[in-house]
Design a protein with these regions (language model features):
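Accessory carbohydrate-binding/adhesion or oligomerization-edge regions at the termini
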Residues: 19-73, 77, 96, 151-155, ...
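Bacterial Sec-dependent N-terminal signal peptides
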Residues: 1-24
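Accessory beta-strand-rich segments of carbohydrate-active enzymes
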Residues: 28-30, 39-42, 81, 86-194
């Protein structure tokens, strides 16, 4: 009898484990680091959707353009940026969002951009983030083309010589995430604080 009961319980457990789940993910965080375009220098047209970025360098994030430059004591920032160049640069990325996700909310999160970044999605201005050490995010939902191509453009302005007292680099130097949630969800406030 004990053997029959044990076998029945094992069989029931296996059937429950194999049953399809009706659970859906409430929050999906996508690694958004791959396939960005980059160009050093500045031009306001670079924020536009139809701007031709085909000649730009393709790279993956995180990226620091200062460390790629030449070590020269003559740069205006001098020792404050380790004798490496600063300046202005642009990043762009083209991506698609499925039509089926029309009822979802999309947020882009930057874990760190040095410094003074401005962000556009499909030519629409999302905002400016001064400095460069804090995580920040923008809601993309009402500006996305569901079922079509979307273009995000990021202008990074690290042209203020000596903005720091140590080497800080330039660019999107930390991870970027595309976060998809239901409209009704718990807001993520960016961490746990213990005092």
């Amino acid at each position: 009898m004990k053997l029959l009961l044990s076998l029945t319980l094992i069989l029931m457990g296996a059937l429950l484990k194999a049953a399809p789940s009706t659970e859906t993910k409430i929050r999906v965080t996508e690694d958004f680091n791959m396939g960005w375009k980059f160009l050093l220098g500045d031009s306001p047209e670079r924020r536009e959707v139809n701007y031709d970025d085909s000649q730009w360098r393709t790279l993956n994030l995180p990226h620091d353009w200062s460390i790629e430059g030449d070590y020269t004591p003559d740069f205006p920032a001098g020792k404050n940026n380790g004798f490496f160049p600063e300046g202005l640069g642009w990043y762009r990325k083209t991506f698609t969002v499925a039509k089926e996700d029309l009822n979802k909310q999309f947020v882009i999160q930057f874990d760190g951009v040095f410094m003074n970044s401005e962000v556009w999605i499909n030519g629409c201005y999302l905002g400016r983030r001064p400095y460069g050490y804090s995580t920040f995010r923008y809601d993309l939902t009402d500006k996305l083309k569901f079922g079509g191509e979307n273009v995000i453009a990021v202008r990074v302005d690290n042209s203020n010589p000596g903005a720091d007292r140590w080497y800080h680099g330039s660019g999107i130097y930390r991870n970027v995430h595309l976060i998809k949630t239901n409209y009704v969800h718990f807001r993520h406030n960016g961490g746990i604080y213990i005092t």
